[in-house]
């Protein structure tokens, strides 16, 4: 087992990697004609903070796993207290920073760009941004104040060890901790909605898209030429009618205008399709078999994620401490899921578990990006902003960053469902008489130390059972939307290769 200092060195490396990765993603999607430094900085900071919350988990697990030796004995109480307080403080700093970025900085930057005009001075835009941001600041203060007064109550539990653990760890919260957790829980509820809409669809659409690929260029070209010929034929009919001296009705003039717009759009698409087979893009065809292989691997990973989540949900019903009153918190997972087994086995061999967690998070993050790209930034059926390569406006980029941040907050909770045993206690064991057994919630509180992420999620679920219930049934909704998205992805027609290289949106014209 590596010392905890190795974990913090790895975490510092991950921090730098995440900053570089998020900067690349933000610049990749930023509009090439309209990109702001404020938008870039705030988006990178917000995305990095939420991902750090998840990437801190393996370090948290290493921290608690190195508190007990292989014979079940523990390190000194002073070292335990010092190390747990350090990790807990970092979690709360990250959560508090997320609240500040998502509820204050992002709204300010959004309204700052909304007021953009060459004739409006910068100070006026700053004033307008601050004016509208005041409402979000008041909302944040209300959340924190309400959270400070919402205190967890006692639970109907018979097991004395579990009751002692709840009294010592869950009910023993100060006002600051309660307010921050309450505010983060409210944002996480929104995160479940984002996860269900974008991430669940991306988990199926991203790998299926790699497997299916784009339409064959010849077929695509043939379809475009047919549509173009039909549009020109109809347009010629109305044009010849007008040329012969007959007047066109208002409806006919509108139809002719639409047909000419369609002609222009189809001609653009045909030109892009010709360009898609030239230069470097022609070489990319060689890698098509690899895209199919990776797509097949990724869909297996997606199915493994959903299966692990379902097993965890079923297990919570059967082994919950006190049902919905405790937010479906379970003492020890009875049903073993694949990710939990793998990560628990790898926990003593850090950084192998860090690599698995990092790969899993990056995959889910990529699926969320894929979902946002495919669905767009919408409010119900209204498409607010286009989200694509080099054509996302600053306001759209900020909203996309908020969607990704909320999804990452939900992912923070879903990691507990994916690997409950690993996340709660890592590789910790304790001496029970003559045998050494894995740590659980109903183990003596002085012999097992739960990870800080395990304590935080338990405080959210037990502190206000409403959140635990919403998170539990919200996860079932995520599973259902994944199945629906999988069906849609399988039966949906392959996209045109021309659209992949579009610099301008012409969908509306067609």
UniProtKB/Swiss-Prot annotation:
The chain crosses the membrane at residues 1-21, 41-61, 89-109, 130-150, 179-199, 290-310, 346-366, 396-416, 466-486. InterPro entries: LMBD1_LysCbl_Transport, LMBR1-like_membr_prot. GO terms for molecular function: cobalamin binding. GO terms for biological process: protein localization to vacuole. Pfam families: LMBR1. Residues 22-40, 110-129, 200-289, 367-395, 487-510 are extracellular. GO terms for cellular component: lysosomal membrane; vacuolar membrane. It is found in: Lysosome membrane. It is a multi-pass membrane protein. Keywords: Cobalamin, Cobalt, Lysosome, Membrane, Transmembrane, Transmembrane helix, Transport. It comes from the Eukaryota. Residues 62-88, 151-178, 311-345, 417-465 are cytoplasmic. PANTHER family: LYSOSOMAL COBALAMIN TRANSPORT ESCORT PROTEIN LMBD1, LYSOSOMAL COBALAMIN TRANSPORTER-RELATED. Belongs to the LIMR family. LMBRD1 subfamily. Probable lysosomal cobalamin transporter. Required to export cobalamin from lysosomes allowing its conversion to cofactors. This is Probable lysosomal cobalamin transporter. It comes from Dictyostelium discoideum (Social amoeba). The gene is lmbrd1.
């Amino acid at each position: 087992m590596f010392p905890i200092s190795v974990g913090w060195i790895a975490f510092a490396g991950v921090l730098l990697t995440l900053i570089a990765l998020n900067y690349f993603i933000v610049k990749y999607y930023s509009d090439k004609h309209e990109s702001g430094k404020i938008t870039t900085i705030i988006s990178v900071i917000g995305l990095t903070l939420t991902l750090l919350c998840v990437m801190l988990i393996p370090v948290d697990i290493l921290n608690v796993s190195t508190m007990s030796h292989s014979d079940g004995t523990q390190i000194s109480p002073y070292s335990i207290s010092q190390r747990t307080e350090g990790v807990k403080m970092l979690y709360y700093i990250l959560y508090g920073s997320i609240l500040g970025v998502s509820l204050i900085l992002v709204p300010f930057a959004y309204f700052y760009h909304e007021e953009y005009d060459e004739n409006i001075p910068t100070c006026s835009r700053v004033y307008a941004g601050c004016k509208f941001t005041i409402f979000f600041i008041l909302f944040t203060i209300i959340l924190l104040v309400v959270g400070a007064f919402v205190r967890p109550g006692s639970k109907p539990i018979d097991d004395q060890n579990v009751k002692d653990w709840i009294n010592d760890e869950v009910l023993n919260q100060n006002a600051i901790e309660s307010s921050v957790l309450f505010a983060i829980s409210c944002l996480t509820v929104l995160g479940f909605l984002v996860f269900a809409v974008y991430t669940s669809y991306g988990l199926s659409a991203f790998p299926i898209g790699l497997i299916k690929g784009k339409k064959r260029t010849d077929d695509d070209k043939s379809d475009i030429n047919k549509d173009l010929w039909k549009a020109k034929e109809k347009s010629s009919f109305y044009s010849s009618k007008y040329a012969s001296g007959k007047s066109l009705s208002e409806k006919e003039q509108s139809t002719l205008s639409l047909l000419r717009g369609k002609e222009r759009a189809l001609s653009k698409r045909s030109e892009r399709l010709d360009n898609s087979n030239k230069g470097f893009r022609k070489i990319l065809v060689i890698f098509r078999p690899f895209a199919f292989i990776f797509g097949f691997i990724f869909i297996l990973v997606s199915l493994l994620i959903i299966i692990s989540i379902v097993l965890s949900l079923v297990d919570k019903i059967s082994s919950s401490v006190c049902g919905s009153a405790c937010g479906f918190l379970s003492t020890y997972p009875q049903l073993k899921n694949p990710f939990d087994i793998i990560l628990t086995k790898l926990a003593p061999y850090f950084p192998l578990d860090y690599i698995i967690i990092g790969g899993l998070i990056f995959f889910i993050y990529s699926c969320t990006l894929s979902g946002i790209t495919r669905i767009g930034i919408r409010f119900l059926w209204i498409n607010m902003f286009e989200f694509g390569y080099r054509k996302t406006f600053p306001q759209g980029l900020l909203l996309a960053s908020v969607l990704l941040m909320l999804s990452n907050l939900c992912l923070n909770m879903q990691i507990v469902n994916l690997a409950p045993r690993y996340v709660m206690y890592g590789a910790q064991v304790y001496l029970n008489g003559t045998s050494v057994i894995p740590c659980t919630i109903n183990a003596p509180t002085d012999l097992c130390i739960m990870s800080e992420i395990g304590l935080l999620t338990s405080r959210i679920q037990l502190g206000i059972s409403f959140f635990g219930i919403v998170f539990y049934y919200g996860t079932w909704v995520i599973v259902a939307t994944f199945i629906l998205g999988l069906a849609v992805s399988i039966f949906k027609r392959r996209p045109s290769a021309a659209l992949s290289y579009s610099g301008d949106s012409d969908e509306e014209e067609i």
